[in-house]
């Protein structure tokens, strides 16, 4: 299992490396990512760059089903089409302190990726799945949802989180 990095850890700003080899080592990493995901409370998804690992790969694991029985692994994913806009509150496993803020993202997306075994996949997503994928792909590019907020809002959150860290609450 991996440790989930916490903001402001500078490794959260690291861009992931594309996956070139779909081997046993990759399968083990993906299994550990899902193990970490399922062990975390209220976790919808995780990107490799959120985890304490060397050379994080371009991988995200998603499962927000009630029984945690619908795992989705996206490797080298990219959004190839976007439409509409939707603004909704987001939180993040790497940003503690009960931090939720409104973020505007595409309402509908088309994704091209590979599954965990290297098989090409392409699909459309909307609603929570679209938001989740965009949030995780941001992570894989070194962007956290706080980066999408105004400077003023981000400053207030940084100040509040700093105080909580000093109190040992995050």
Curated annotation (Swiss-Prot):
Record has Metal-binding as a keyword: yes
Signal peptide as annotated in the record: none
SUPFAM superfamilies, A to Z: Peptide deformylase
Catalytic activity reported: N-terminal N-formyl-L-methionyl-[peptide] + H2O = N-terminal L-methionyl-[peptide] + formate
Swiss-Prot/TrEMBL keywords: Hydrolase, Iron, Metal-binding, Protein biosynthesis
GO annotation terms (biological process): co-translational protein modification; translation
Molecular function terms, GO-annotated: metal ion binding; peptide deformylase activity
Active site (record annotation): 136
Domain of life: Bacteria
Protein biosynthesis found in the keyword field: yes
EC primary class: hydrolase
Cofactor detail note: Binds 1 Fe(2+) ion.
Stored Pfam families: Pep_deformylase
InterPro entries, per database record: Peptide_deformylase (IPR023635), Peptide_deformylase_sf (IPR036821)
Xref: HAMAP family: Pep_deformylase
Protein role: Removes the formyl group from the N-terminal Met of newly synthesized proteins. Requires at least a dipeptide for an efficient rate of reaction. N-terminal L-methionine is a prerequisite for activity but the enzyme has broad specificity at other positions.
Name of protein: Peptide deformylase 1
Organism: Coxiella burnetii (strain RSA 493 / Nine Mile phase I)
Lineage of source species: Bacteria, Pseudomonadati, Pseudomonadota, Gammaproteobacteria, Legionellales
Underlying gene: def1
């Amino acid at each position: 299992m991996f440790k989930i990095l916490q903001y402001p850890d500078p490794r959260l700003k690291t861009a992931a490396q594309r996956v070139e080899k779909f081997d046993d080592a990759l399968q083990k990493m993906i299994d550990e990512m899902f193990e970490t995901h399922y062990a975390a409370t209220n976790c919808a998804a995780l990107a490799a760059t959120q985890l304490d690992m060397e050379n994080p790969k371009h991988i995200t694991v998603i499962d927000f089903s009630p029984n945690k029985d619908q795992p989705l692994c996206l490797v080298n994913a990219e959004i190839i089409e976007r439409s509409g806009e939707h603004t909704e509150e987001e939180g993040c496993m790497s940003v503690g302190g009960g931090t939720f803020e409104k973020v505007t993202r595409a309402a509908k997306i088309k994704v091209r990726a590979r599954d965990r075994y290297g098989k090409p996949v392409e699909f459309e997503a909307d609603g929570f799945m679209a938001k989740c994928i965009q949030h995780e792909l941001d992570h894989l590019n070194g962007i956290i949802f706080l980066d999408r907020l105004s400077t003023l809002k981000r400053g207030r959150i940084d100040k509040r989180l700093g105080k909580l860290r000093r109190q040992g609450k995050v």
